[in-house]
C-alpha cells in the first residue's frame, strides 16, 4: 500500500509497519510524516490499550532512525529501551523512597495497592533529556505512557515543555486523552487508533508465540464477558486473561455472585482487599459490571460499583471501601 512512497529523498517501505493491523488511517499519517520529513515536535497516540499504539510508536521511531526503512539493529535497541537517545517514561510506584516503573513492579514484588503515577520528577527528567544534544540520532526521542496518570504538577511541567519543545520528538500514548489538559492536547499532533474487528483480533492473537493467543481465545469462548471487556483490543483480551488467571480459584468462584447477607459481604470484602492487589481489585469491578450489565440487572448496582472504583482510585482504605459497597449492594 505504501511501498515506494517518497518525498524529499526519504522512501518509506511497507514492511516498516507490517505488524500493525487494523489501523490504516494511523499508519497512513505516520508514513506520510516520514516520507515528507515533516515531523511534529509532539504526537498524541490516542485510542484503547492493546490495539497497536506502542508498536506504532516504536516502528515510527525506527523509521526515523532508519531513513524510512526497517532497521533491525535500531529496532532491537528501541524495543530493549537501551538506545542512548530514547527515554521511555511510564507511571511509577513509590516504593521505599524509590520510583519503580509499572513494568518492573511485579517482578520485584512491589505492592500495587494504589495506582501508579507519572510524577513531577519524571517530567523534569524528560525536559532535561529533550534539552540536551542527541548522541546518535537527529533528535532526542521520548515516549510517555499513560500521561493521564500525571498529577497536576507534572501536567503543568509537561505543558511548559511542550511550549518550548526544542528539537526533540515526544510521543504520548494515552487511552484516555479526555483526561489530559486541553492545552496539552492542542500542542500535540493527534493520531487516533481504533478498536479492531473480531476477525482482525483473531488474526493478531494467532500470531502470538507459544499458542498464547489461542489459549486466550479458548478461555474467552468459555467466558464471553472477557471478550466483551476486551472490546476490540487484542492486548486488552490478553490482559483480562492474565488478571482472570491471577485471581485465586476459590475467590473467583465466590465472585461469580453478589453476596446476599451482611456476613457474606464483610467476609468477601476482607478477602478481596487482603488477597488482591489494587489492579486486580479494579479489574474485578470491571468484570462484575460487565456481568451485571449483560444480565440487565438493576442500574443502581452498576452505579454503586462505579463509586467503589472511584473510592479505590482516590486511595480510600480498600477494605473499608469494599465493605461499604458490598453492604449497599445487598439491598440494591
How does the language model describe each region?
Residues 2-78, 131, 167-169, 174-332:
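Charged, glycine-rich active-site and insertion segments that engage polyanionic ligands
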Residues 29-34, 99, 103-141, 149, ...:
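Conserved alpha-helical scaffold flanking the Walker A/P-loop in AAA+ ATPase domains
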Residues 40-46, 83-91, 133:
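Conserved ASCE/P-loop NTPase catalytic core
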Residues 72-98, 178:
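AAA+/P-loop NTPase substrate/partner-engagement loops
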Residues 142-145, 158, 168-175:
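Structural recognition of the conserved hydrophobic beta-strand(s) that form the central parallel beta-sheet
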Residues 146-150, 165, 177:
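Conserved Walker B
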Residues 151-153, 182:
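Conserved D-loop-proximal element of ABC-family nucleotide-binding domains
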Amino acid at each position: 500500500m505504501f511501498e515506494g512512497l517518497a518525498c524529499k529523498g526519504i522512501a518509506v517501505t511497507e514492511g516498516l509497519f507490517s505488524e500493525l493491523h487494523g489501523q490504516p488511517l494511523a499508519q497512513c499519517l505516520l508514513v506520510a510524516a516520514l516520507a515528507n520529513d515533516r515531523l511534529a515536535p509532539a504526537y498524541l497516540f490516542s485510542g484503547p490499550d492493546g490495539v497497536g499504539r506502542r508498536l506504532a510508536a516504536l516502528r515510527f521511531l525506527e523509521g526515523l532512525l532508519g531513513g524510512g526503512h526497517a532497521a533491525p539493529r535500531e529496532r532491537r535497541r528501541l524495543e530493549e529501551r537501551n538506545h542512548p537517545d530514547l527515554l521511555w517514561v511510564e507511571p511509577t510506584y513509590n516504593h521505599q523512597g524509590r520510583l519503580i516503573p509499572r513494568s518492573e513492579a511485579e517482578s520485584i514484588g512491589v505492592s500495587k495497592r494504589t495506582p501508579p503515577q507519572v510524577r513531577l520528577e519524571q517530567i523534569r527528567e524528560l525536559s532535561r533529556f529533550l534539552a540536551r544534544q542527541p548522541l546518535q540520532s537527529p533528535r532526542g526521542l521520548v515516549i510517555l505512557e499513560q500521561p493521564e496518570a500525571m498529577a497536576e504538577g507534572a501536567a503543568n511541567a509537561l505543558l511548559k515543555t511542550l511550549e518550548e519543545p526544542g528539537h526533540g520528538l515526544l510521543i504520548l500514548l494515552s487511552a484516555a486523552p479526555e483526561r489530559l489538559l486541553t492545552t496539552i492536547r492542542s500542542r500535540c499532533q493527534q493520531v487516533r487508533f481504533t478498536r479492531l474487528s473480531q476477525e482482525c483480533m483473531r488474526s493478531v492473537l494467532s500470531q502470538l508465540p507459544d499458542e498464547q493467543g489461542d489459549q486466550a481465545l479458548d478461555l474467552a469462548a468459555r467466558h464471553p464477558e472477557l471478550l466483551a471487556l476486551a472490546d476490540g483490543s487484542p492486548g486488552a483480551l490478553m490482559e483480562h486473561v492474565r488478571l482472570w488467571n491471577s485471581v485465586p480459584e476459590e475467590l473467583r468462584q465466590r465472585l461469580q455472585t453478589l453476596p446476599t447477607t451482611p456476613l457474606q459481604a464483610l467476609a468477601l470484602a476482607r478477602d478481596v482487599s487482603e488477597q488482591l492487589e489494587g489492579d486486580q481489585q479494579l479489574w474485578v469491578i470491571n468484570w462484575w459490571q460487565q456481568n451485571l450489565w449483560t444480565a440487565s440487572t438493576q442500574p443502581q448496582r452498576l452505579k454503586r460499583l462505579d463509586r467503589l472504583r472511584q473510592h479505590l482510585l482516590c486511595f480510600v482504605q480498600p477494605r473499608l471501601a469494599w465493605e461499604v459497597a458490598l453492604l449497599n449492594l445487598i439491598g440494591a
